[in-house]
């Protein structure tokens, strides 16, 4: 068996007073395709940065096979020092790296190389960073959320490119289909530890649930054993002194073990404010046409959306998905055609831009608005700590300033704030960006149980397949087609 390329052994790391890792392990083998999964804030990105040598650890050992090359894709690439995307990509080449791949990668990722970083979109910045990371064909390729801001065509191209590489590839992603198509092994980062599944991600969730159930059973057995020993201390201390001293010491050890176990934070339990029912139809578009300058976005498109439907909208970046959404909502008028809106609509829009919040607010203040300890969900008053727990926040995070939250935690906060308000039309514009897999599970349940109409714009194939009943898909040349079901 070939030796590993990189290992992390017994890694410990603490931020402030909170331990992030307590004995984390990672092994990268030749021809590896490993996915790293875990909840937001569990330390996935930090573990990847430790492996890349970008973050120091407090204790433990990092070993890298001499002479290997590594490349790391950051979540937020910085192109501010470069005049063009090509200049940024070429700057990533070193030594014997050959620049022949750059035109191929630019073409595959729909870039010209002449893009100005100052005006590039999030998707263009991400594609440029991918090209820079992929260009050298490194021995180890580390990708942190590579599908964020990519459209479906770019995601599928990236899957095929990764499959063609001989590099060992480590992936952090919330895109289930992407992980299922690429991973060979799965590393779960959970409460400071790492657990390895020697199988593809498609087996992970069943394995995780069984592991947590067994852990719950083991903890219950430990609690019962402590109870029996405590009973002995009260009623049965007699006989040989040495035996008694040892048994008392064992009881102390059991208590410490029980106390220091980090329990699972549970599952999301999303509460949605009640609202009045909308009319029978939500929005009707009749033969609409829309252009921006010389670019025609829609040409003779019609659809009628009725109450209770789950509508998905898919298409390449720049094809007009958000414009279509705004036309459906009556926020943008078509150049030709007719738009009719239903009655009694109460829309709730959760979009990829994230609402602007005061970063100095605490999490509690952002949820209560008035700084009290109650959250108003429709007409119901819920204690802020309970409401936080429903969205996987810990009670001790109540006083955490918003600037200290991760991208995924801010996404959960946006959901928590939005769902306080009554609505009967839920609009999700790229809702899966930055959310962890558990949050996506519950967002899917929310869409399924929502007592109203849902419209989703997304590049997440698995999310669409699990949630929508009809899909509006971009075909080509301003033509859009309606299909039953998901992607």
Label every PLM stretch briefly.
Residues 229-238, 252-253, 268-275, 282-284:
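Alpha-helical coupling/stalk and coiled-coil linker elements that connect catalytic or binding modules
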Residues 1-219, 270-487:
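ABC ATP-binding cassette signature C-motif
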Residues 207-240, 244-248, 254-261:
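Intracellular alpha-helical coupling/juxtamembrane segments of multi-pass membrane proteins
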């Amino acid at each position: 068996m070939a030796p590993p390329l990189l290992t992390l052994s017994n890694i410990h790391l603490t931020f402030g007073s909170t331990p992030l890792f307590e004995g984390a392990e990672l092994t990268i083998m030749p021809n590896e395709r490993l996915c790293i999964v875990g909840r937001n804030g569990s330390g996935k990105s930090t573990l990847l940065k430790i492996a890349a040598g970008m973050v120091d650890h407090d204790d433990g050992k990092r070993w890298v096979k001499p002479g290997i090359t590594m490349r790391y894709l950051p979540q937020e690439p910085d192109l501010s020092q470069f005049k063009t995307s090509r200049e940024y990509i070429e700057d990533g080449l070193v030594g014997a790296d050959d620049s022949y791949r750059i035109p191929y990668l630019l073409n595959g990722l729909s870039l010209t190389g002449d893009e100005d970083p100052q005006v590039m979109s999030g998707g263009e910045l991400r594609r440029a960073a991918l090209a820079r990371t992929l260009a050298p064909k490194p021995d180890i390729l580390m990708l942190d959320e590579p599908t964020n801001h990519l459209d479906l065509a770019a995601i599928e191209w990236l899957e095929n490119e990764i499959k063609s590489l001989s590099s060992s590839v480590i992936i952090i992603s919330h895109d289930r289909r992407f992980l299922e198509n690429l991973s060979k092994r799965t590393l779960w980062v959970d409460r400071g530890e790492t657990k390895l599944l020697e199988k593809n991600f498609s087996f992970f969730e069943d394995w995780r649930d069984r592991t947590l159930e067994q852990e719950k059973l083991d903890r219950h057995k430990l609690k019962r054993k402590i109870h029996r020993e405590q009973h002995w201390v009260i009623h049965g201390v007699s006989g040989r002194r040495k035996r008694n001293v040892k048994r008392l010491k064992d009881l102390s050890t059991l208590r410490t073990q029980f106390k220091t176990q980090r329990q699972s934070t549970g599952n999301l339990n999303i509460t949605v404010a009640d609202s009045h029912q909308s009319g029978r139809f939500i929005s009707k578009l009749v033969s609409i046409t829309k252009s921006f300058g010389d670019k025609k976005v829609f040409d003779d498109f019609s659809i009628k959306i009725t109450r209770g439907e789950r509508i998905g909208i898919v298409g390449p970046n720049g094809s007009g998905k958000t414009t279509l959404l705004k036309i459906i909502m009556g926020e943008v008028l078509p150049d030709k055609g007719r738009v009719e809106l239903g009655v009694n609509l109460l829309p709730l829009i959760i979009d990829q831009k994230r609402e602007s919040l005061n970063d100095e607010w605490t999490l509690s203040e952002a949820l209560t608005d008035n700084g009290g300890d109650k959250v108003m969900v429709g007409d119901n008053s819920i204690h802020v700590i309970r409401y936080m727990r429903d969205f996987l926040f810990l009670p001790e995070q109540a006083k955490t300033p918003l600037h200290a939250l991760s991208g995924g935690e801010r996404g959960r906060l946006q959901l928590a704030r939005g769902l306080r308000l009554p609505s009967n039309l839920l609009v999700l514009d790229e809702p899966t960006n930055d959310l962890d897999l558990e949050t996506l599970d519950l967002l899917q349940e929310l869409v399924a149980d929502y007592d109203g109409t849902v419209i989703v714009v997304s590049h997440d194939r698995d999310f669409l397949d699990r949630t929508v009943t009809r899909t509006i898909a971009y075909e080509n040349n301003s033509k859009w087609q309606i299909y039953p079901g998901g992607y």
